Amino acid sequence: MQLGEQLLVSSVNLPGAHFYSLESARGGGGGGGGGGGGGGGSVSLLPGAAPSPQRLDLDKASKKFPGSLPCQAGSAEPAGAGAGAPAAMLSDADAGDTFGSTSAVAKPGPPDGRKGSPCAEEELPSAATAAATARYSMDSLSSERYYLPSPGPQGSELAAPCSLFQYPAAAGAAHGPVYPASNGARYPYGSMLPPGGFPAAVCPPARAQFGPAAGSGSGAGSSGGGAGGPGAYPYGQGSPLYGPYAGTSAAGSCGGLGGLGVPGSGFRAHVYLCNRPLWLKFHRHQTEMIITKQGRRMFPFLSFNINGLNPTAHYNVFVEVVLADPNHWRFQGGKWVTCGKADNNMQGNKMYVHPESPNTGSHWMRQEISFGKLKLTNNKGANNNNTQMIVLQSLHKYQPRLHIVEVTEDGVEDLNEPSKTQTFTFSETQFIAVTAYQNTDITQLKIDHNPFAKGFRDNYDSMYTASENDRLTPSPTDSPRSHQIVPGGRYGVQNFFPEPFVNTLPQARYYNGERTVPQTNGLLSPQQSEEVANPPQRWLVTPVQQPVTNKLDIGSYESEYTSSTLLPYGIKSLPLQTSHALGYYPDPTFPAMAGWGGRGAYQRKMAAGLPWTSRMSPPVFPEDQLAKEKVKEEISSSWIETPPSIKSLDSSDSGVYNSACKRKRLSPSTPSNGNSPPIKCEDINTEEYSKDTSKGMGAYYAFYTSP
């Protein structure tokens, strides 16, 4: 074993160990090889170091090898020690000769040459006291001194949650506490992390790190961190992290943590900004807040968690909004620029006291403290007593500040004790007061995160976050999909659900039929005729499905008609076997068939609850409006109700209804009624409809003439 290793191992237990030079230790180790030559094994002290107050007494040394027999008293003094060698340590050779010669009954040592341990008859000093002064100069590495921390229980306590980043308030100072990095950079954490990291409830009151830090740097929260002392590092070990709280410090300078048991002004609040991530999103684009005459609430609003208060003391908690800089701002070129000086003569209320003030510290620490009802206004004559609206001036930058003031039980503040007032500032809560949003990024953030920002949503589709393919129906502004009566993806649900389930789906699952009617003179545009060239891919209704209304929810053409008036046409479902029947989309028959059968699933009144109905009002469909008026005038005839629904159609297939009307008059199986004379039917056909007939008229004749 080398002498340097012996020094590192054994001197830790020395009560008065000093700094030893390894160079001199190596020199002394070379002369200690002789059996009785102890003089060469002595070690010199560092220059300027005081001599050891006591020499090494082997009788008081620790027992390293319990297997050795006790030594005789007075036999542990080395031969070289009497030659005037300074009180130091023995080399392995010296110790081996001594123990080997004086202990007559000693057992042979281990094969590696180590000898038995010395006697231990007296109690050694505590390990913590010895370790507090155990420092060495490793000149083989560098000229610095390395401090060896004690392995006591204090080191484990410092790893507790209470030793997180310090987070004092910033009051009067431009920045909070700073942590000096290795490269000299300084990082302010004053508006980011709380002073204790965790509430005092998880920290026992009697914590060692809250006591005085003798000889260490001051707490990082009060002076910016003593760069050399252990108190400058939140994860440091050894001496206590935080110095004692000084009640005479400036108000708002949150220093070290105050223990829960310290009375009086030693309580310091620790404040967290609860919705800080949301504030940061707005802060990246320079937050803007709307101000109005009636007052407008802030979004994001101020929300805090408070810890470290005296549970039995009473506090007032209020927010003050002050100017953040002396500049007047304007939005130009996509960014905010200064344009002159701010108006400092603005009169009006600048404070908002929380409605629950005054209250005890335990009340404030129990839950989140929200200022969601705080309103901003530009009305200088706002009543301060009722609404507590904060009066601001447009295009000025403001900084909210949180004040916590200790008061009496009656809510009276002691103005002679400024230390009872604590102020906290969060730089990310700065905002510019505006009468209308200037930055579109801020507007979008308000829409995305504020559930009450309905004034910015001009239509319902802006609330969707899913892609267009994920919707059941398309947007009314899409083209050409908006010109389809039955979009392909709209009724694809019938492939997966049985018919009873589809019929019972709520109407809110589908858009109203008015959204899909083309805004043209005719019902079908040429573009749609091309789209439905292959109709079997879109027609998903089987021939046995009678309630066609549930599939063709065209509310604009069936709102005024009942199934009873069209009963002759709703007895059977339309046969889909013929090629002409499959070409139903350009055929004007189907708009009228939208009213056949039961119409309870889709009502026009349901469209009133949908945000887009204002766009699709009746003026958009003038033909439909005229048709409704004509129906009201001639409601006495059951045959009159059918033609108005197709009166606006300019399709060449309108002769289908012409033939159907004649069949009503000529068929012997269906006698004419008194309220539908044949002449009336002929007049309607002559005045309003074309005489042309479609190619597949035979299919309709065959259908209606069948018994």
Swiss-Prot record:
Pfam families: T-box, T-box_assoc
Coiled-coil region(s): none
Gene (UniProt): Eomes
InterPro entries (UniProt xref): p53-like_TF_DNA-bd_sf (IPR008967), T-box_assoc (IPR032385), T-box_DNA-bd (IPR046360), T-box_sf (IPR036960), TF_T-box (IPR001699), TF_T-box_CS (IPR018186)
Induction: Up-regulated in CD8+ T-cells upon activation.
Biased composition range(s): Gly residues: 27-42
Start-end of Basic and acidic residues biased regions: 680-689
DNA-binding region extent: 278-458
Domain of life of the native organism: Eukaryota
Sequence segments annotated as region (Required for transcription activation): 592-707
Protein name as it appears in the record: Eomesodermin homolog
GO annotations of cellular component type: chromatin; nucleoplasm; nucleus
GO molecular function: chromatin binding; chromatin DNA binding; DNA binding; DNA-binding transcription factor activity; DNA-binding transcription repressor activity, RNA polymerase II-specific; RNA polymerase II cis-regulatory region sequence-specific DNA binding; RNA polymerase II transcription regulatory region sequence-specific DNA binding; RNA polymerase II-specific DNA-binding transcription factor binding
Chain positions with Phosphothreonine modification: T473
Phenotype seen when the gene is deleted: Embryonic lethal due to peri-implantation defects. Mutant embryos arrest soon after implantation and fail to form organized embryonic or extraembryonic structures. Conditional mutants, with expression abrogated in the inner cell mass of embryos from early implantation stages onward, display gastrulation defects.
Comp. bias intervals (Polar residues): 648-657
